[in-house]
Amino acid sequence: MSHHPDLSVSLDQLLLRKEVRVRQQGEWLKRHSLPLVSFTVNMPGAFKLNAASQTVMDAGMRAIQELCQKTGWRQVACQLLVEKTGPEAFVVIQAPSASMLKKAMMKIEREHPLGRLMDLDVIDVDGHIISRQGAQLPRRRCLLCERDAVICARSRRHSVEALLAKIEEMTHDYSCCA
């Protein structure tokens, strides 16, 4: 993966973007009074906006649309953002409950070929993020060794290069076979 140096992202830029995203989430919840899916891509390293992250975002948005068609849930509003910090989306979905919506998003994360690269947060109308633990689901597994992903990330068990090579392989395989 080659990268343009201007697209490198610092930790400060990531944290600032997260603050802005939280504010935007609040505005969306106020405007629609329905659960909100806040979709970001899990991409290690300093380059968050690349072909692989775009492939993951496109695949995730298709999966959400297919879910809505299959369940009869209505997608009320949607916004895609292409930020230097990576692609993002806000999707307001009229589902029976935020917890049912979270279970459906976790199913996408679990079963979609690129699901492990998707971060599909569900925020209820009161602004609370519904967590994996709250839904009694295990934490994410590492892409490379199947251990707890949080532990691998904190200990830097794998190099960014090894993780990016795996992501490149996953998105290539998906693009070829989808």
From Swiss-Prot:
Family: Belongs to the CitX family.
A Pfam family reported for this protein in Swiss-Prot or TrEMBL: CitX
Record-listed E.C. numbers: 2.7.7.61
Catalysed reactions, semicolon-separated: apo-[citrate lyase ACP] + 2'-(5''-triphospho-alpha-D-ribosyl)-3'-dephospho-CoA = holo-[citrate lyase ACP] + diphosphate
Nucleotidyltransferase among keywords: yes
Keywords: Nucleotidyltransferase, Transferase
Keyword Cell membrane attributed: no
HAMAP family associated with the record: CitX (MF_00398)
One of the protein's GO biological processes: prosthetic group biosynthetic process
Superkingdom of the source species: Bacteria
GO MF assignments: holo-citrate lyase synthase activity
Protein name per Swiss-Prot or TrEMBL: Probable apo-citrate lyase phosphoribosyl-dephospho-CoA transferase
Broad EC category: transferase
Described function: Transfers 2-(5''-triphosphoribosyl)-3'-dephosphocoenzyme-A on a serine residue to the apo-acyl carrier protein (gamma chain) of the citrate lyase to yield holo-acyl carrier protein.
